[in-house]
């Protein structure tokens, strides 16, 4: 028995529940899919299909659950979309209003820009042209954009998003022209197909296979990337044609999904679909047409959302990057409706991933999956060397921005900073802009990079997006206050208040940052400076060179309200210290951090075969062995026996070991490295 049309409180929702061992993997197997095919696309090493390692398959089958819940079930009744938009507590600035200056963010953005401009539009559009029956002489791309890869077309969507964000941030005409050219090419293909708005680089037969439960590689995943890219081109690059093409695609999705029963659609959702819910909610938001939100509601995967709504971590065995985008979509629905189920599940999901499933870098997963119960990373880390899929870090950062906007809690920015500094800035190769698929935590691992024309992994795509919009989280604001979240050289223009502020810093090489008011109204306003959780109570602030009596509490904001004048300067000092961070279930396995920076032991990359440099992840058994020593603690604190190296910023050396090692930030480590150590 289920309840219908009854408003339920959080308290009623959280009643007891029971589980039976039939879940996503079993359901998808019965539906004609392999467990991995139903849950994710991430490690396809051939062009058409992927079978996960036996260990991952076994864990999928053992761990997934189908929830049986004491009534009322959270999603028993059909969803009804009722617009009741949330007013977020904090809002980000438009990309054009935050200008990056010298430092790691502007470098990464430039490398990424050059990577994108090095891929010709006719090559990107080739598969779309062929699918539409249009002539093309363009040379095909390889990897996941090869003509026989079932995920072909996804990177084109990522490219559109990257071009849109780059243009929004820089106003550069060349990058806008690239994005506009792709949109025009896609519109041409859509008109030629003339199929109710359908557009992709593969035929609708892929969706017929999805409908019949036959193996196919995530067609809605690819559609989402294209639709999201079109959305971004409209929102950030003022391309009206992009909205027209997107609306046509949404119409096709609406018609296709509307023809399925609720039960059948739930089975279809066992195959990875990216953030289809999110992009449809976004389209509803900008058009005011709730038709698209109702279409987005059809992508509510109840088997996954129900445990989260009941605050139960049943993530073991699930493919991480299948599910994080689904939660981002849930967060977006909460913002449009204030339906607490979607807000609660987004919050709980973030909490359980970041508190019980997170490595020191802020990343999560092994072999693309959560392979263990919460707080068992000591077991998971040893299963394979393919830790921390980069797409997952990117999408967790997207989710963080939603939650931070709702609450304004500094802890979200502590997490965001950790992922950005260690994971995201640590996986883009200087100059080439080539990026990795995984960030391995295996001792003696190395970073394996994509190539210019023959990879196009999912993580190549999310990386292209991310490094285009690195200015989007440094500052937020409410009606009265400017929030300084991250410490990078930059300028912000708060147009509504007539405020301009410049941040000068060489953080993290330096413990200081300086905020200079360049323009201010006569009325008072507030500046809130994040005091990171990693600093000490000895943090200090100065206003116009005079010490302030107040110190900020680590993990909060220092609030300064005054009638600011042009030339006012705030200097913030955040002492950094060296700390050890053990795994919860194995305290002898530890990572070391300096402030927010994860440190990595440095080992030479000697005699590593070239072909091992460009795989999706490090193949440890095929590489020459590296001897990573165990360490013996020589004091109560890590700083007692790991000391800075004079004259070498952010470089440290152990002392008193049988074999001492040098440590540098992981994001600067391009040899072989070790992050976690056996410490006695």
Task: Outline where the language-model segments fall.
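Long, well-ordered core segments of solenoidal/helical folds
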Residues: 108-139, 179-197, 244-261, 291-311, ...
């Amino acid at each position: 028995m289920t309840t219908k049309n009854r408003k339920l409180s959080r308290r009623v929702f959280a009643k007891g529940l029971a589980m039976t061992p039939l879940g996503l993997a079993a359901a998808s197997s019965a539906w004609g899919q392999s467990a991995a095919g139903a849950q994710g696309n991430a490690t396809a090493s051939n062009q058409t299909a992927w079978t996960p390692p036996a260990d991952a398959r076994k864990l999928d089958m053992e761990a997934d659950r189908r929830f049986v819940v004491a009534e009322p079930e959270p999603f028993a009744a059909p969803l009804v979309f009722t617009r009741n938009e949330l007013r977020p507590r904090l809002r980000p600035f438009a990309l054009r209003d935050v200008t990056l200056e010298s430092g790691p963010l502007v470098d990464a953005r430039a490398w990424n820009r050059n990577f994108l401009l090095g891929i010709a539009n006719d090559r990107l559009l080739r598969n779309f042209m062929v699918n539409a029956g249009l002539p093309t002489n363009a040379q095909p791309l390889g990897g996941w954009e090869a003509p026989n890869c079932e995920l072909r077309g996804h990177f084109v969507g990522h490219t559109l998003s990257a071009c849109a964000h780059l243009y929004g941030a820089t106003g550069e005409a060349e990058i806008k022209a690239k994005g506009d050219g792709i949109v025009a090419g896609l519109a041409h293909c859509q008109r030629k197909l003339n199929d109710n708005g359908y557009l992709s680089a593969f035929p609708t037969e892929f969706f017929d296979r999805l409908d019949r439960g036959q193996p196919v590689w995530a067609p809605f995943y690819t559609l989402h990337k294209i639709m999201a890219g079109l959305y971004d081109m409209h929102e950030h690059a003022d391309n009206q044609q992009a909205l027209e093409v997107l609306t046509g695609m949404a119409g096709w999705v609406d018609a296709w999904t509307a023809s399925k029963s609720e039960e059948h659609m739930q089975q279809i959702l066992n195959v990875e679909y990216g953030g289809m819910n999110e992009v449809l909610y976004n389209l509803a938001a900008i058009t005011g047409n709730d038709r698209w939100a109702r279409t987005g509601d059809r992508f509510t995967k109840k088997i996954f959302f129900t445990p989260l709504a009941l605050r139960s971590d049943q993530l073991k065995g699930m493919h991480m990057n299948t599910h994080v985008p689904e939660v981002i979509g849930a967060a977006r629905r909460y913002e449009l409706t204030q339906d607490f189920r979607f807000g609660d599940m987004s919050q709980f999901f973030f909490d359980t991933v970041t508190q019980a499933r997170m490595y020191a870098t802020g990343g999560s997963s092994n072999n693309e999956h959560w392979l263990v119960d919460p707080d068992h990373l000591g077991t998971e880390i040893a299963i394979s060397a393919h830790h921390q899929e980069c797409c997952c870090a990117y999408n967790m950062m997207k989710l963080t921005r939603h939650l931070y906007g709702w609450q304004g809690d500094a802890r979200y920015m502590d997490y965001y900073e950790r992922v950005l500094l260690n994971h995201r800035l640590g996986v883009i190769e200087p100059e080439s802009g080539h990026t990795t698929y995984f960030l391995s935590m295996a001792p003696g691992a190395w970073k394996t990079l994509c190539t210019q024309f023959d990879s196009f992994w999912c993580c190549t795509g999310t990386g292209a997006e991310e490094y285009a919009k690195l200015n989007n989280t440094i500052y937020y604001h409410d009606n009265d206050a400017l929030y300084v979240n991250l410490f990078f050289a930059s300028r912000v223009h708060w147009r509504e208040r007539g405020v301009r502020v410049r941040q000068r810093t060489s953080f993290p090489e330096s413990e200081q940052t300086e905020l200079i008011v360049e323009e201010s109204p006569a009325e008072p306003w507030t500046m809130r400076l994040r005091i990171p959780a990693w600093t000490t109570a000895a943090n200090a602030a100065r206003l116009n060179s005079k010490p302030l009596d107040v110190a900020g509490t680590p993990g909060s904001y220092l609030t300064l309200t005054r009638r600011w004048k042009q030339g006012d300067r705030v200097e913030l000092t955040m002492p950094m210290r060296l700390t050890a961070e053990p795994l919860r279930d194995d305290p002898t396995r530890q990572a070391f951090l300096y402030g927010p920076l994860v440190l990595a032991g440095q080992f030479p990359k000697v005699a590593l075969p070239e072909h091992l440099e460009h795989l999706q992840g490090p193949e440890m058994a095929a590489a020459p062995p590296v001897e990573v020593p165990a360490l013996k603690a020589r004091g109560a604190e890590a700083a007692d026996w790991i000391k800075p190296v004079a004259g070498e910023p952010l470089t440290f050396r152990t002392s008193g070991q049988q074999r001492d090692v040098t440590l540098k930030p992981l994001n600067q480590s391009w040899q072989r490295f070790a992050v976690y150590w056996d410490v006695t």
